[in-house]
Design a protein with these regions (language model features):
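Active-site loop/oxyanion-hole signature of alpha/beta-hydrolase fold enzymes
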Residues: 1-44
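Gly/Ala-rich beta-loop-alpha elbow adjacent to hydrolase catalytic centers
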Residues: 45-49, 53
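Conserved alpha/beta-hydrolase "acid-adjacent" motif
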Residues: 165-171
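Flexible "cap/lid" loop of the alpha/beta hydrolase fold
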Residues: 54-59, 64-95, 99
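Core-facing hydrophobic residues within beta-strands of well-ordered domains
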Residues: 64-65, 179-182
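Conserved alpha/beta-hydrolase catalytic His-Asp/Glu region
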Residues: 77-83, 94-151
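Short beta-strand/loop motif that positions the catalytic acidic residue
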Residues: 152, 158-160, 164
């Protein structure tokens, strides 16, 4: 079975108060897994979710069979991102959540808002509050998992696309070089 929890403040969990740290997000996902009485599981995370899964492995790595890190890195304040997180935070405050939700998600797709499945992101962002976006940006900015990479013993698949404008090759290569049992695709 597949369980895809929506982090507090996002998607179907938009009414729940959002969290402002990657560690707190990891703990809430682990709580969800524990409530479902799942002892061992495969784990996948994309972008900020990739930071969350790295933190989950740090907290409870013995419960994780295999790890998939998709378009993510080990440094939350993402080097060479299409714009710095500080700029994203500043623009969120100036432009508001509606404009930010129109501006940033298209960057996640090669064909922007014209991409076949873009509507899924667009729909998920509809209920996201400015506070949730602010908390998420700050959570990423303040997180750094670089020191823990060597401790990730789980078999790890790293997936990255060469058109990614958030995470450059140096970020994913850092994951691949420092996670002992990893493979980059």
């Amino acid at each position: 079975r597949v369980i895809a929890p929506a982090l507090p403040g996002f998607g179907e969990s938009y009414k729940i108060k959002s969290l402002n740290s990657i560690n707190a997000m990891a703990k809430i996902v682990l709580k969800c897994i524990q409530e479902k009485k799942i002892n061992k599981f495969n784990l996948m995370g994309h972008s900020m979710g990739g930071m969350v899964v790295q933190e989950i492995v740090k907290i409870a790595g013995d419960k994780v069979n295999k790890l998939i890190c998709f378009a993510t890195g080990s440094i939350g304040n993402i080097p060479d991102r299409f714009e710095s997180l500080d700029v994203s935070i500043k623009r969120l405050k100036e432009d508001g959540i509606k404009e930010t939700a129109k501006r940033i998600p298209p960057k996640w797709f090669v064909h922007g808002s014209k991409a076949k499945n873009y509507y899924l992101c667009e729909n998920a962002a509809k209920e996201t509050s400015e506070e949730t976006a602010y908390n998420a940006l700050n959570a990423m900015k303040n997180w750094n998992g670089l020191e823990n990479l060597k401790n990730i013993k789980n078999e790890t698949l790293i997936i990255w696309g060469d058109k990614d404008v958030s995470y450059n090759f140096n970020q994913v290569e850092m994951l691949n070089k420092n996670v002992p049992n990893s493979k980059l695709e």
